[in-house]
Amino acid sequence: MQRYNLHLPKVLSKGSGNEQICLTRQARSGFQMPLLSKHPRKQQRSQGDRATSGDLSGRCDFLRSLGVWSIYASYFPARLHRSEPLLPTRKYIFGYHPHGIISHGAFAAFATEALGFAKLFPGITNTLLTLDSNFRIPLYREYALAMGIASVSRESCENLLSKGGLDGEGMGRAVTIVIGGARESLDALPHTLRLVLKRRKGFIKLAIHTGADLVPVLAFGENDLYEQVRSENHPVIHKLQMLVKHTLGFTIPLFHARGVFNYDVGLMPYRRPLNIVVGRPIHVVQQRDREKIDDDYINHLHSLYVQELERIWEEWKDKYAKDRTSEIEVVA
């Protein structure tokens, strides 16, 4: 059986350079149908590996800047706020909190230009990270790569922060990790802020190994976009959710919000403000030898990181979390 490649035609020959580059890059990078290949599984793995290579050649700034993303962000509306400028001569790990149900704020702020990231932080190329399994799905994989999204695997993070950039070693690059992950989504209740963070220190060790400064990010309103069934009131549901998490790496919160033509039941998020505040960077001293990274230094940076999150909360809670029913809480 012969192998067929389906390439995108150059239909934008009269358009902007960015438009044509985006199409030709996707064509050259293997926008193919795996089922028509002699070795579909091998091809699928090789295409998925592009998400961990640290190579941003599939990133399409034209797609990231489409007007549809501005419409998407204005639905809530979502806004991005900067505590202070970031130097393009450093590299960064942005830690996004909370996860919420779907992390709408993380997508709007760091996977698109709808909120003006490039204007707020000129010279910094930020890559939003997600589960590696998302890059094993044909078509969706190409879409994610074009949006500048990459795998959250350790290999991917290290490659992104140690290759390319201004100096060929990651200068001017950043990654955004939703630190709380699937576990935190189960605590995504309106008007609360419960962060799964006490034991999450892998990203701190990654920062030390790569020499990337830590940048805490707090999204006010992320947990307010959906209502969720409280799993602690339903032990069977909670056990099932945790089983799915351990098996598949993600969980399935039971949630609802509004519909297209009603405000009571549906899967569309509520129209509630999203204010994403980027905190002050925490300087990290690089230690290339992973085995020699000191636990005391990891704990010290983790403590500074939590303190910066708490500072953001205290500074902005009366403006962006007026309807809160509790204060910020950091749990294991």
Language-model-detected regions and their locations in the chain:
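Pol beta-like nucleotidyltransferase catalytic core
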Residues: 274-277, 294-313
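N-terminal low-complexity, Ser/Thr- and acidic-residue-enriched intrinsically disordered segments
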Residues: 1-81, 88
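Structured cytosolic regulatory/catalytic domains appended to multi-pass membrane proteins
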Residues: 181-184, 306, 310, 332
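C-terminal helix/juxtamembrane-tail motif
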Residues: 318-332
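Charged, glycine-interspersed solvent-exposed loop segments at helix/strand-loop junctions
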Residues: 288, 296, 321-325
